[in-house]
Design a protein with these regions (language model features):
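Cytosolic-side transmembrane-helix boundaries in multi-pass membrane proteins
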Residues: 2-73, 77, 256, 263-270, ...
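Alpha-helical transmembrane segments within multi-pass membrane transporters and channels
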Residues: 137-177, 332-333
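Single transmembrane alpha-helix segments in multi-pass membrane proteins
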Residues: 71-136, 160-167, 313-328, 360
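Transmembrane helix-bundle core of multi-pass membrane transporters
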Residues: 170-245, 271-274, 294-302, 377-380
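Interfacial loop-to-helix junctions that mark the boundaries of transmembrane helices
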Residues: 53-61, 85-91, 137-142, 214-229, ...
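Transmembrane alpha-helical segments in multi-pass inner-membrane proteins
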Residues: 283-284, 293-359
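Hydrophobic core segments of alpha-helical transmembrane domains in multi-pass membrane transport
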Residues: 64-76, 105, 180-185, 230-240, ...
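Helix-loop-helix "hairpin" substructures at the membrane interface of multi-pass membrane proteins
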Residues: 138-148, 152-158, 219-297
Length: 380
C-alpha cells in the first residue's frame, strides 16, 4: 500500500528541488493541520513555459551556429567546388584535428581555467610514443601505452600545481608550455640526433595502430578520416557528461564560483585536476593521430595550436571567465575553423588573409555570444 492511502507522510520535492515530508489527508506526522501550499513563483512559471525562441536564445552555441551558416554561404558562392562531398570531407578532417582538442579545452574553460600547454602536449605525446617504441624495439602499442601514462601525468601535474599553489592557470600552463617546448626539442636531438623522430612504419603493431588513429573510411564513395569519428564521439561523450551527470554540474559550479561550489560540497580540487587530465587525454589521441599519419614526428610542431583550440572554444560560446559554454559549441567552433582554412584554398584567395578572418570570427562570435547571453538572462 502506498503512503498516500495509509496516511503516512510522503516525501516530494519542494520548490528548491530537495525532498521534504508533506502530508496526505491524514495530517502531518505531528498532528498539526497541513498548511496551504505556497503559490509557485512567477519566474518559475516563465521558465516552465518558456517559448521555443527563448530556449533557443539561451543556448551557448547559438552565435557559432549563425557564424558557421554565414561562412558556409560565403564559400558556397565564392568557391565552386566547396559543397562537393570530397571538399566537405576535407573540411571535416581539418575540423576534426582541431575539434578533438577543442572539446576538452572547452570543458576546461567552462570550469574556469585554460591550458597554454595543450598544443605542445600533443607533440610530446607523439614523441614519447615514437621514441619509446623505436629505442626499445617494442610493439608500437606499448609505446602508445607509455605515452598515455606520461601525457595524463603531465595533465594531472598542471592541475595539481594549480590547485596547490593558487597560481593563475595562465602562469602554470605557460611554464609547462615552455618546459615541454624545450624538452621536445632537446630530447629528440639527444636521442635521435635530429629534430625529428625515426620512422616506425615497419615496426610491430603499426598497421593496427594506424587503423585506429589514422585510417580512412569510405562512405558512399567518399573518403573520411577516422579522426572525424573520434571527434564526434568526444562531442557526444562530453555533452552527456555536462548535461546528464553530476560531474557536469560540478564543472559548471566550479567555473561559476569556486568558493560557493566548495561550500555546498563540490570537490573543487578533484574536478579541476580531472579537467586538466581530460585535456591530456585529448592531446594523447591527437598525438597518436599525428604519429601514425606520418610515421615520424617533428619536435617543433604544435607551438601556437593551443590558441586555435581556445579560439574554437570561445567561438563556440565558452566564456573566458568560466561557468558557461557547451561541447557542441566547441565542435561548431572547430567546424568554423575548418571551413575557413579550407574555404580560402578552394576559393583561391591569398592564404595570408586566413589569420585576419580567424581574428574577425573570434571578435564577432564573442560579441554575438555576449549579446545572446544578455538576452537569455533578461528573458529569465
Amino acid at each position: 500500500m502506498s503512503a498516500a492511502t495509509d496516511g503516512t507522510p510522503d516525501a516530494t520535492p519542494d520548490a528548491t528541488g530537495g525532498g521534504r515530508p508533506v502530508t496526505t489527508p491524514g495530517g502531518r506526522p505531528d498532528g498539526d493541520p497541513a498548511p496551504a501550499a505556497a503559490p509557485r513563483a512567477s519566474a518559475d512559471e516563465r521558465i516552465l513555459h518558456a517559448s521555443p525562441l527563448r530556449k533557443l536564445l539561451s543556448r551557448p552555441e547559438l552565435g557559432s551556429v549563425v557564424g558557421a551558416l554565414a561562412v558556409l554561404l560565403v564559400f558556397a558562392f565564392a568557391a565552386d567546388g566547396f559543397l562537393r562531398a570530397s571538399s566537405l570531407s576535407t573540411v571535416l578532417y581539418a575540423s576534426s584535428t582541431i575539434g578533438i582538442m577543442a572539446v576538452p579545452v572547452a570543458l576546461l574553460m567552462i570550469g574556469g581555467e585554460f591550458d597554454l600547454s595543450a598544443g605542445v602536449l600533443v607533440t610530446s605525446s607523439a614523441l614519447v610514443s615514437s621514441m619509446f617504441s623505436y629505442q626499445m624495439t617494442a610493439n608500437v602499442w606499448v609505446g602508445a601505452g607509455v605515452s598515455l601514462l606520461v601525457t595524463l601525468a603531465i595533465g594531472a601535474f598542471n592541475g595539481f600545481v594549480l590547485t596547490r599553489t593558487g597560481l593563475p592557470s595562465f602562469i602554470v600552463t605557460l611554464g609547462t608550455f615552455l618546459m615541454l617546448t624545450g624538452m621536445n626539442l632537446g630530447f629528440t636531438k639527444l636521442i635521435d640526433g635530429t629534430v625529428s623522430t625515426k620512422t616506425i612504419a615497419d615496426m610491430e603493431g603499426f598497421p593496427s595502430a594506424h587503423a585506429v588513429f589514422a585510417s580512412t573510411l569510405t562512405v558512399g564513395g567518399v573518403d573520411f578520416k577516422i579522426t572525424i569519428v573520434w571527434w564526434l564521439g568526444l562531442v557526444a561523450l562530453a555533452s552527456w557528461v555536462l548535461l546528464r551527470t553530476r560531474t557536469g554540474n560540478w564543472i559548471f559550479a566550479v567555473g561559476g564560483n569556486k568558493d560557493a561550489a566548495r561550500a555546498v560540497g563540490v570537490p573543487v580540487t578533484r574536478t579541476r585536476i580531472g579537467l586538466y587530465t581530460g585535456v591530456a587525454l585529448g592531446a594523447w589521441i591527437s598525438g597518436q593521430h599525428l604519429l601514425f599519419s606520418y610515421d615520424a614526428v617533428q619536435s617543433g610542431e604544435g607551438v601556437g595550436n593551443e590558441l586555435i583550440y581556445i579560439i574554437a572554444a570561445v567561438i563556440g560560446g565558452c566564456l573566458i571567465t568560466g561557468g558557461y559554454g557547451s561541447a557542441v559549441g566547441s565542435a561548431v567552433g572547430a567546424l568554423l575553423f575548418g571551413m575557413t582554412s579550407k574555404g580560402i584554398v578552394f576559393a583561391e584567395w591569398n592564404p595570408d588573409w586566413f589569420k585576419f578572418f580567424l581574428g574577425a570570427m573570434l571578435l564577432l562570435a564573442t560579441l554575438l555570444n555576449a549579446w545572446v547571453r544578455k538576452r537569455a538572462e533578461a528573458a529569465k
